[in-house]
C-alpha cells in the first residue's frame, strides 16, 4: 500500500455541458440534505416537475458563461496547487456532490492508487448541513455501501482561519483600488442563501458568515458595508435581505459605487460569473449604479492555497 495521504476535495460541482444541466439539477433537487420537497417518496417526482420547468432557463445562464461550469477545472487546479505546497506525501482527488467526478469515482481512484489515509477537505468555508453536511453524508454513505476501509479525517469549516480572512481581505482591498475614491464605495458581501428554517433548527451557517464579514472588515478597516444573500431556490422563506433587494436599496439611497464580495464561494461558477457579473450587473446599471465591480474569486490565489495547506497539515498531525 502507498504511504501517501489522499487529499479529497469536496465541492458542489456543476454541469460540464448544456446537456448536463438537467441531470445536475435533478441531483440537486432530490438531495434532502439541501432541500426537502414534500415526503421523501414523492420528492423525485416533484423535483422532476420543477427541474423540467427550470432547466431551459438555467441552460441559458450557462450558455452565457461559456456553455458549462468551470468548477471542475478550478477545483483540480486548487488540488494541484496544494500538492505543490504539501509535497510528494500527498496526492489530491476531487469529489463533486452533483457532477463528475463523483464521490464514488474519487474513492475508487484512491483505492486504485493503494492509498489508505484520506483527508476530506470541504471547500465550503462556512459549515451548513446543506453543503458540507451533504457532501460528508454522501462520502459516508458510499463508504458504507462499498465496504472500503480508509483512515479518514474531515476538515468541515474554515470561516475564521487567519489565512482565509487575509486572502478575502486582500481581494477586497484590490477591489476598492479599482474605484476613483474608495471612501465612496459600498462593500456588498453576497453569500449563498439558505432556508431560514435551517438556521432556526441550529445550522451555524449564518453565524459563520457574519463572523467572516466581521473579521474581513477588521482587516480592511473603515468602510460602509452590508451583507445580503443570493441564489434563493424555492418558495419557502430564505435568509434576507436578498442581493437584488439590497442593490435596489443602494440605488434608492443614491449609492453609485458598489463592490460585490462573493462569500461562501471559493471558486468562480454560475453564482459569480452569471448571477453577480451579468444578472446583478445589468440590474445595477438599470438602477443608476455607475460602478459595479466584483472582487476576484479566491480560486488558486497563493494566500488561499496557503490556508488550505495549513488546514491539511493540522489535520495530518
Swiss-Prot record:
Enzyme's top EC category: lyase
The alphabetical list of record keywords is:
Cytoplasm, Heme biosynthesis, Iron, Lyase, Metal-binding, Porphyrin biosynthesis
This entry carries the following GO cellular component terms, namely: cytoplasm
Q: Which InterPro entries match?
A: Ferrochelatase, Ferrochelatase_AS, Ferrochelatase_C, Ferrochelatase_N
Q: Which residues form the signal peptide?
A: none
Output one GO BP term.
heme biosynthetic process
Q: Where in the cell is it found?
A: Cytoplasm
Q: What is its main location?
A: cytoplasm
Q: Which SUPFAM superfamilies match?
A: Chelatase
Reaction(s) catalysed (UniProt annotation): heme b + 2 H(+) = protoporphyrin IX + Fe(2+)
Query: For this protein, what is the EC number?
Result: 4.98.1.1
Source organism, top-level taxon = Bacteria
The function of this protein is:
Catalyzes the ferrous insertion into protoporphyrin IX.
Among NCBIfam families, the record links this protein to: hemH (TIGR00109)
Name of the molecule in the record = Ferrochelatase
